[in-house]
Amino acid sequence: MSFPEEIKRARQRCFLTQDDFAKEVKVAFSTVNRWEGGKAKPNLTAMKNIKEFCLKNDIDYSSIEEAWLDFSVEGKEK
């Protein structure tokens, strides 16, 4: 799965809206929207917060991390 699909799946497994997930990982709603739309890639701070969210909610973080490492926003380098 691609990073946008992985992050959306993690959010939906906890039955959260994009807004609620954004609050959990300490970013703006629009940021989560851009991640899921493939228009942005989380920075290291955001990835740390996503990892903490996954650990707290018993979600496999490794697939998200792998997808993040392989993901590049169109028009930008990895």
Residue ranges and their predicted role:
Residues 44, 61-78:
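Short, charged recognition helix plus adjacent turn
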Residues 6, 31-34, 46:
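Residue-level recognition of specific faces of alpha-helices
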Residues 8, 12, 26, 37-39:
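Residue-level detection of the helix-turn-helix DNA-binding "recognition helix"
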Residues 45-63:
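DNA major-groove recognition helix of helix-turn-helix/homeodomain DNA-binding modules
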Residues 15-34:
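Short alpha-helical DNA-recognition segment
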Residues 5-20, 49:
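Short basic helix-loop element that most often maps to the first helix and adjoining turn
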